Curated annotation (Swiss-Prot):
GO cellular component terms given for this protein: chloroplast; ribonucleoprotein complex; ribosome
GO aspect biological process, one term: translation
Organism in which the protein naturally occurs: Illicium oligandrum (Star anise)
Lineage: Eukaryota, Viridiplantae, Streptophyta, Embryophyta, Tracheophyta
Subcellular compartments: Plastid, Chloroplast
Domain of life the protein comes from: Eukaryota
Residues spanning the membrane: none
GO MF annotations, alphabetized: structural constituent of ribosome
Name of this protein: Large ribosomal subunit protein bL33c
Length: 66
């Protein structure tokens, strides 16, 4: 049986351009995606290019703390 922490964790990705434009972190005007990552393969912060419906373009979405 596997012991220790779970390898796959749930992370939240937030639009970096919406966050830079002065939008509050908890406001509904910031695009967020929920996904999973493998801690062993990607120990650092995850960044993916996703579509932001508030910016109307593809932007970098970075991992945020819960």
């Amino acid at each position: 049986m596997a012991a220790g922490k779970d390898v796959r964790v749930t992370v939240i990705l937030e639009c970096t351009s919406c966050a830079k434009n002065g939008a509050n972190k908890k406001s509904p005007g910031v695009s967020r995606y929920i996904t999973e990552k493998n801690r062993h393969n990607t120990p650092g912060r995850l960044e993916l290019i996703k579509f932001c419906p508030y910016c109307y373009k593809h932007t970098i979405h970075g991992e945020i703390k819960k």
